[in-house]
Amino acid sequence: MAFYHRTRSEHWLRDKQDDGKSLILEDESSWEIDPEDQFITARWLRGSTILVEFTEKGEYPYLLRNWTEGERARANFLGEFRAVS
């Protein structure tokens, strides 16, 4: 499992894919969202302020808190997203 070192810092949502199944933050970090929370992240808007927390709980050990929307979702850190040119 990849470990994300920039927890407890403010980030913003750069992009979301597949109706909220995965998210990319401004620091190029890529996140797989817990299927039970994908209906929540499907509504999140680009530019929303996100705080990442490491919870160590279950299959999705990170919690993405969307301060803009007042919502949260469980997630897995997938690593850094790199666009193919």
Predicted region positions:
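Short capping micro-motif at the N-terminus of alpha-helices
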Residues: 33-34, 75
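Short, Lys/Arg- and Gly-enriched loop/turn segments at beta-strand edges
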Residues: 55-66, 71
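Terminal membrane-proximal soluble interaction domains of membrane-associated proteins
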Residues: 23, 52-55
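Short nucleic-acid-contacting surface segments enriched for D/E, G, S/T with interspersed K/R
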Residues: 36-53
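Short solvent-exposed loop/turn micro-motifs enriched in small/polar/acidic residues
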Residues: 14-17, 45, 57
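Short peripheral tails and domain-boundary helices/loops at the edges of structured domains
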Residues: 66-85
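Structural detector for short beta-strands of small beta-barrel domains
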Residues: 1-18, 79, 83
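Short, basic/aromatic beta-hairpin or loop at an interaction surface
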Residues: 15-31
